[in-house]
Amino acid sequence: MLKPLGDRVIIEVVEKEEKTIGGIVLPDTAKEKPQQGKVVAVGTGRVTDEGKRIDLDVKENDLVIYSKYAGTEVKHDGKEYLIVRESDILAIVG
């Protein structure tokens, strides 16, 4: 499994099948980049200038919404993940 460092979070991207109003399924090339996913791992937190470690607000299994162009896409064990900084996460769903 991947282990993020510092204030980074690993997100498993949740992809929805997109259809037009007429019921046509859109190919991957025509889809918007997803902005929602499930947190699968969190780093140890960020360190302040004084050396104090601050825990992250998100936790494993949180469903989150993140910035559209955030992070680095990686493939691991056949699954697609996104590694983002916690500051790129906009909201926790639910």
Curated annotation (Swiss-Prot):
One of its GO terms (biological process) is chaperone cofactor-dependent protein refolding. Its main location: cytoplasm. GO terms for molecular function: ATP binding; metal ion binding; protein folding chaperone; protein-folding chaperone binding; unfolded protein binding. Pfam families: Cpn10 (PF00166). SMART domains: Cpn10 (SM00883). The keyword Aminoacyl-tRNA synthetase does not apply. One of its GO terms (cellular component) is cytoplasm. Heptamer of 7 subunits arranged in a ring. Interacts with the chaperonin GroEL. Belongs to the GroES chaperonin family. NCBIfam families: PRK00364.1-6, PRK00364.2-2, PRK00364.2-4, PRK00364.2-5. Together with the chaperonin GroEL, plays an essential role in assisting protein folding. The GroEL-GroES system forms a nano-cage that allows encapsulation of the non-native substrate proteins and provides a physical environment optimized to promote and accelerate protein folding. GroES binds to the apical surface of the GroEL ring, thereby capping the opening of the GroEL channel. This is Co-chaperonin GroES. It comes from Exiguobacterium sp. (strain ATCC BAA-1283 / AT1b). The gene is groES.
